Amino acid sequence: MAFEQSPLPFAPDALESAGMKAETFEYHYGKHHKAYVDNLNKLVEGKAEFVGKSLEDVIVMTAGNADQAGIFNNAAQVWNHSFFWNSLKADGGGAPTGDLLTKIEAAFGSYDAFKTEFAAAAATQFGSGWAWLVEDAGTLKITKTVNADNPLTKGQKPLLTLDVWEHAYYIDFRNARPGYIANYLDKLVNWDFVAANLAA
């Protein structure tokens, strides 16, 4: 059975008031994400070891294997993008509340300290990649990954991500990655999704 592109969890124009145009999703979701799905299906076609496997299974199975780098890169990018869409929400951003805020304050000292550290991780990821909030051995941590890599390969639980590939922000912010990061933290973070991941 072929892998399928997950639907956007919002209308393509739903985030325009928060700084992300429908055109961004036309290209980012409609072309980039779709291409990863199409490429993955071509690469695993006829390979019995991938039959019935989830994206997470494929990512873990192929991580670090140079002979299967194409499969890993496309599978991870399919997963990363689906996770990223769910990390976005109209009228999102700002500080979380309740138990999640308590955990962030315990791990980073304050929400503002978390925000500063996350923004720095996203801004300093050289070239293409992702910034993440993860749970690692019961502790919240911020990490970043290059290209298609993701925390699943390190046994970490992803809670939140921000895509810092240039195609993620060039339509809306041109080359101003820091502005894109600040806008995400202030207006777009889906804390309900983060809380659900933490509780899972």
Residue ranges and their predicted role:
Residues 1-200:
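Feature for soluble, non-membrane regions of globular proteins
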